Amino acid sequence: YGWMTMRALKEGYVTLEPALLFPFGGKEEIEGPNRQKLDQDLQYLGTSILAVEVYKISRLIDVACERPEVDKDRIAMMGLSYGGCYTLYTAALDTRIKAAVSSCFFNERKRYLWSDWSYFNFMNEFNDAEVCALICPRAFMIEVGDNDTLFAVDGAKAESVRAKKYWDGLGLPDRFNFTAFAG
């Protein structure tokens, strides 16, 4: 992932890398719980794996804020792919996050009806732009790859136009950024 964490460390940031539940790592599957089955079971109980993971990240921020080297007024979050998903949703729910970068996830969610973010009636309530409304007026950046084979760049561009309206409406267009990069 381009050594994101190392680059942040070199710039003087305190970084955290939460351990999240994924059924894969690199090219080989990791043995353990089936993520989709676990998510389905959690949804029967009224929650989801996404909600559990966002809660874990928020608790990690609690712990980090107790450390003297962490300025709790300058918390930022960035993530790539699933990390971009967790960044979008955690920043929407945890207002301690003052700036967030969601890379290679943000899109027109209706194109990707995966169990991780498909809930009863969600299309009538929250697409990615509406989740962004919960981040606004805090700083938010979306990065997408022009050659992403998973999430289409045109969907991300269209959804970002809808999201940007929240910042524009408050006269804060500089706090929202959409970037498509070669890759």
Language model features with spans:
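C-terminal catalytic histidine-bearing segment of alpha/beta-hydrolase fold enzymes
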Residues: 161-183
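Structural recognition of the beta-strand scaffold that forms the well-ordered cores
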Residues: 15-18, 76, 99-102, 134, ...
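The feature captures the conserved acid-bearing segment of alpha/beta-hydrolase catalytic domains
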Residues: 99, 108-168
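Extracellular/periplasmic catalytic domains that process cell-envelope and extracellular macromolecules
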Residues: 8-10, 134-136, 171-172
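Alpha-helix capping and helix-loop boundary segments enriched in small/acidic/polar residues
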Residues: 44-52, 78, 119-127, 150-154, ...
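Cap/lid segment of the alpha/beta-hydrolase catalytic domain
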Residues: 1-66, 109-116
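Primarily recognizes the serine-hydrolase "nucleophile elbow" in alpha/beta-hydrolase
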Residues: 11, 58-124, 128-131
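Residue-level marker for beta-strand->alpha-helix junctions and adjacent short loops that shape enzyme
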Residues: 22-23, 82, 107, 147
